[in-house]
Amino acid sequence: MNTLALSDKIIFVFYFIIVATYGYWVYRKKKNDVSASQDFFLAEGSLTWWAIGASLIASNISAEQFIGMSGEGFFVGIAVAAYEWIAALTLIIIAVWFIPIYLKNKIYTMPQFLKTRYNESVSLVMAIFWLFLYVFVNLTSILYLGAVAINGLLGGDYLHVVMIGLMLMALLITLGGMKVIGYTDVIQVAVLIIGGFATVYMALQIVDQRINGALAGSAITGFKTLISQAPEHFKMILPKPNNTDMSAAGQLARDKYIVLPGIAMYFAGQWIVNLNYWGCNQYITQRALGAKLETARKGILFAGFIKLFMPVIVMLPGIAAFVLYKNGQLPGFEGGKDGAYSAILAFLPVGFKGLAIAALTAAIVASLAGKANSIATIFTLDIYKKYLNKLADEKKMVWTGRLTVFVSMIVAVIFTWQDLLGIGGEGGFTFIQKYTGFISPGVFAMFILGLFWKRTTGTAAMAGLITGFVLSIFFNNYAIGIFGTENIMYTAYLNKSGAYEIPFLINMGWSFVITVVTMVTISFAGPKVNPKSFEIDASMFKVSKSTLILIVITLMLLSALYVKFW
């Protein structure tokens, strides 16, 4: 049974005290401003570039990465790092081309963008869509995976106690507003990175000790052991499997390819996942929307630079767990692939385990707080103020935002209490990507055409949203029955349940392409220049010398990584 020594508990409590104290200090320092809705929801103009970058990472790297991506590292290997490394390139695109348009047009929420560019109907529909997605997919999965992981480390049956504890910690930070979230995220990221790298270092030492019999254990030798013991786990591009191979190895290859369909994913859903997540997502863009352009750009690029190194923290422990499991060194391993990270943490010595749990908790709490604040922002600014109480003053809006945070957390706890959504069965990381992917194609099509093509109309946007959603359902449930298992658009593969399945990233790619064609066709029936289109000029996209240097460094490192692991 996993238990925590006194020193581990002291380290964990010390982390909690630091975050709570610092958050309260920030709250008290800006207490007079917190009553202003813009400050509560956006921390308008007060976050530095490094705070923006840290907050982006803290909000992004949570249980679905620590637990879910580590699980995919156990199952698939380094190929899952595509989500992190393509994100680095995506953040460059967002910083250079998306953010200038948002800031010039004073966009504070994503539904507001849709109202400004299209119409009220599109904005309202998407506000409701996002609220459901954030509460029932994101909040629930983060809370469930985090509680499962920490419960496994504590030993015993404390799952529901941990859930409530995580909720209360997130509430403590969230109720202080975006400024408190932004600056406490700096501490969260510091703990996350220090604890994450310490965990990886110790995990590699454990591999050397357990597999090679080394007394002290070397992290470098441990890493070399991972490569020699699991070479297939260090390939970025998975080979296309064969549907006729009925062996266990053949089935495993198909199951991996369904999750990450080789080179094809780079021409399909991988870009949609990243560009939609980082550029059209209130939860993420909110960190930069209250800042000046240069500050926002540097913060986003700083986050992109950090993303290059995140697979080391979130993926290598999963591969280490796979090698140990393969060699019979994880006899008590349970929980499927999502149990990989907890299995590694259980090996850590006294003291390090407390630091690792603090890092994991930091990631979970920061992400819960950020997501809850985004839910409150969308509901308060885009639904409550517009439709329920148009005369609401600043204090009333902040009060409503705090109430929304509380209610959303309670709903998330209710649905994760008995895992009503089946998150554990899907695997946490895949659960989020798959079900977010049902609306991503339509949403991203609306944004990309709305930003950069002046003829796009509100009618086309609504049609695109509906088309993207319907097509996602069609490809997931009906395409195989109508078009068969293989055609020019896709190849379906036998999954572990014995049914044919199209890789969801391929589904997303085709849903997006057809949605764009639909929107363009409808827009051609409208005016040549939509009066609601944004004015764009080349000067908006010029970057400073320091910004350009950071972009070049990031691109060089990214290229080197792909050359090494292709």
Where are these regions (language model features)?
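Membrane-embedded helix-loop-helix hairpins and adjacent transmembrane boundary segments
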Residues: 1-566
